[in-house]
């Protein structure tokens, strides 16, 4: 055998070995893929889809939800009965082809199975998602229905528990509840017939009506309590109190109180009847109006009761107060009569006393009897209170006026005594001023001083004449005394001024001698001032003339002389 043949045989053997090894490797890889596909198929088949289907089925779906569920359930049945069986068959075929080294067809089967598994996985995911959505929707719907039914059941329980608190509205409430029950029945019928949209609308309306009726029933008991308990109790209390007050001789400014009681009761009945319409705003407004009318009656009675207490108190005060004022008036009249014999009094005192008499007589004639028998009067105590209050205020005004008159007349004699004392002092002062001026040895007395002196003397004489009358006019005495006081003070001040100007002028005229010989201005002022001093007796003008001239040549000289004079000035000795 030639070497070429040997090499060919070896090559063929090697190729066979290599081909076998390659086949073994491919077969092993395909076995791995087939095993993986089998495991994947088992994992998909092992998903809890059946449990989820049974869970959704237990929800007893209806309508569109039930149709959707049936479609997805059928799809799962198709997958389990057909698709998984077909996949199993293709896996078995792939194993057989792989075992027989038919790798190309085996690979085709493996790819086919993988594609089918991908589709199955997508379908299962879609089925599970759809089941989850159906379950979630049904749970939401069930929760809504449960919530609405719970609201209604609570409303039923509340109404049943508080049935006695709804009064005339109970029939209307029961009617509204039957309407809500009908809406729930309509919801069930529509939902069962596969019309979820309209069923949801009906459920919404039923829930809204339940909530609204619940709110109404929460508010009604308070309104009914007012109409059936509070108002009747208050009216009974008012009527009982009214009868008791009448027995105690109370009278009222209004004569239709019984009619007002009846009108309020009719309003209560009318509002109770209207309440069946469940118009709560109107019912509350009417209740407020009724309460205001009841309150006005309470205020009326309380006002009269309070007035009675005030009248009872003032009825004791007024007689004593009147007697006190009359006593004061008598004393004042006696005092004025006594003083009138000696003095001419102001007409005001007499007029005031007459006015006081008139006020006191009016109270005595018209009010005193009322105060002493106030509980026998046929007038409301509030009116009696006004009468007594006015009278007591009048008495207070009279008393204040009496005090003013007393203050005016009590000092009359003192005014006369003081006026006489002052007159005596002023006459003495007038003489002392005259002597003071005479001792000054002036060239003459200024005319303005003489005028003031004689005016003051006349005023003192007028006061003296008034005090010498048989009946003294005390007002004139007071006025003249004030005038005399001011006149004496003015005369005293003028006296000091005249003497000061005269004395200082003499001193300055003498002092000016040191400048006259060489100051023409001083010489001229000297001559003019001397004339004013000796001829005209105008001492102030003379002082002004010479002091001005000296100030021009020796500033401050006048102030020096004035200061020196004030330190040594002689005072009038009164």
From Swiss-Prot:
Residues 27-574 are cytoplasmic. It is a single-pass membrane protein. Residues 102-131, 161-190, 276-379, 459-493 form a coiled coil. One of its GO terms (biological process) is division septum assembly. The chain crosses the membrane at residues 8-26. It comes from the Bacteria. It is found in: Cell membrane. Pfam families: EzrA (PF06160). Residues 1-7 are extracellular. GO terms for cellular component: plasma membrane; septin ring. InterPro entries: EzrA. The keyword Cell division applies. The keyword Transmembrane helix applies. Its main location: membrane. Keywords: Cell cycle, Cell division, Cell membrane, Coiled coil, Membrane, Septation, Transmembrane, Transmembrane helix. Belongs to the EzrA family. Negative regulator of FtsZ ring formation; modulates the frequency and position of FtsZ ring formation. Inhibits FtsZ ring formation at polar sites. Interacts either with FtsZ or with one of its binding partners to promote depolymerization. This is Septation ring formation regulator EzrA. It comes from Streptococcus equi subsp. equi (strain 4047). The gene is ezrA.
């Amino acid at each position: 055998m030639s070497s070429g043949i040997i090499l060919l045989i070896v090559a063929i053997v090697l190729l066979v070995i290599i081909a076998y090894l390659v086949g073994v490797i491919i077969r092993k890889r395909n076995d791995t893929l087939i095993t993986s596909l089998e495991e994947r198929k088992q994992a998909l088949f092992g998903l809890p889809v059946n449990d989820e289907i049974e869970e959704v089925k237990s929800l007893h779906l209806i309508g569109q939800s039930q149709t959707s569920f049936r479609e997805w359930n059928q799809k799962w049945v198709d997958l389990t009965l057909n698709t998984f069986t077909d996949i199993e068959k293709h896996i078995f075929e792939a194993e057989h082809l792989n075992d027989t080294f038919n790798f190309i067809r085996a690979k085709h089967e493996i790819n086919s199975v993988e594609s089918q598994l991908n589709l199955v996985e997508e379908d299962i995911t879609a089925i599970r998602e759809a089941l989850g959505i159906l379950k979630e929707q049904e749970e939401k719907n069930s929760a809504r229905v449960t919530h609405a039914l719970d609201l209604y059941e609570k409303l039923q329980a509340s109404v049943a528990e508080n049935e006695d608190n709804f009064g005339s509205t109970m029939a209307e409430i029961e009617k509204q509840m039957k309407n809500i029950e009908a809406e729930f029945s309509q919801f069930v019928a529509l939902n069962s017939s596969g019309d979820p949209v309209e069923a949801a609308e009906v459920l919404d309306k039923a829930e809204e009506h339940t909530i609204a009726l619940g709110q109404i029933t929460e508010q009604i008991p308070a309104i009914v309590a007012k109409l059936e308990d509070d108002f009747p109790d208050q009216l009974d209390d008012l009527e009982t109190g009214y009868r008791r007050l009448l027995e105690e001789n109370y009278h009222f400014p209004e004569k239709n109180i019984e009619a007002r009681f009846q009108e309020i009761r009719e309003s209560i009945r009318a509002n109770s009847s209207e309440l069946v319409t469940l118009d709560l705003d109107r019912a509350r407004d009417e209740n407020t109006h009724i309460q205001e009318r009841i309150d006005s009656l309470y205020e009326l009675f309380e006002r009269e009761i309070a007035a009675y207490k005030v009248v009872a108190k003032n009825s004791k005060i007024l007689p004593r107060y009147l007697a006190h004022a009359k006593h004061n008036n008598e004393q004042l009249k006696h005092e004025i009569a006594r003083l009138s014999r000696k003095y001419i009094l102001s007409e005001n005192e007499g007029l005031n006393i007459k006015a006081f008499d008139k006020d006191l007589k009016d109270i005595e004639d018209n009010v005193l009897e009322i105060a002493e028998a106030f509980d026998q009067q046929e007038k409301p105590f509030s009116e009696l209170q006004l009468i007594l209050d006015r009278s007591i205020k009048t008495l207070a005004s009279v008393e204040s006026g009496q005090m003013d008159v007393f203050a005016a007349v009590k000092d009359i004699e003192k005014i006369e005594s003081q006026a006489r004392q002052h007159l005596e002092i002023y006459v003495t002062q007038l003489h002392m001023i005259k002597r003071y001026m005479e001792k000054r040895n002036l060239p003459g007395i200024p005319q303005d001083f003489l005028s003031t002196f004689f005016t003051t003397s006349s005023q003192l004489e007028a006061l003296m004449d008034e005090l010498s009358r048989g009946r003294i006019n005390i007002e004139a005495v007071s006025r003249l005394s004030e005038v005399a006081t001011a006149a004496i003070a003015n005369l005293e001040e003028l006296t000091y001024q005249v003497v000061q100007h005269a004395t200082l002028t003499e001193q300055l005229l003498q002092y000016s001698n040191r400048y006259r010989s060489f100051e023409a201005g001083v010489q001229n002022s000297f001559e003019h001032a001397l004339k004013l001093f000796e001829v005209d007796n105008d001492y102030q003008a003379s002082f002004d003339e010479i002091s001005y001239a000296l100030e021009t040549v020796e500033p401050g000289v006048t102030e020096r002389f004035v200061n020196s004079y004030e330190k040594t000035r002689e005072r009038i000795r009164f």
